[in-house]
Design a protein with these regions (language model features):
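Short beta-rich binding modules
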Residues: 1-126
């Protein structure tokens, strides 16, 4: 598959807990006239019930690099709050015309953010 770059607009955002207890985010992006894809979907943490001596207690788990990942997305798009993302023009790099968004970029600057590369760098110690 060949990569392609398109101009797009962030049409919707989600930051919240899925029904199975995982904290996730997604940016919905319209691009190339009829294409709409989501960017993100990765888990930041989880909440779950743990039975401790016959009593259910809600436990929370944070995953590494969560705050940095969110901040890198905001920096890339050029905003300071999650709420400002909706309506912003961006560039998207996809693995095909209607495929997965693999990176999101600033509309004017040569500034990109790729989630998979971000985690690979963190895991390798760079």
């Amino acid at each position: 598959m060949s990569e392609a770059i398109y101009n797009g607009i962030i049409t919707d955002t989600k930051l919240g807990v899925e029904d199975h207890g995982l904290l996730t985010f997604t940016l919905g992006v319209d691009f190339d006239e009829h294409a709409h894809c989501g960017f993100g979907g990765c888990s930041f943490g989880a909440s779950y019930l743990e039975d401790s001596s016959g009593k259910s207690v809600r436990k929370y788990r944070n995953y590494p690099y969560t705050s940095e990942l969110l901040m890198r997305i905001l920096e890339t798009v050029g905003v300071s709050t999650w709420e400002e993302l909706k309506g912003k023009y961006v560039r998207v790099k996809t693995n095909s015309r209607f495929g997965k968004i693999i990176a999101i970029g600033h509309i004017m600057k040569e500034k990109w953010f790729n989630i998979e590369e971000f985690y690979k760098e963190k895991e390798s110690g760079y």
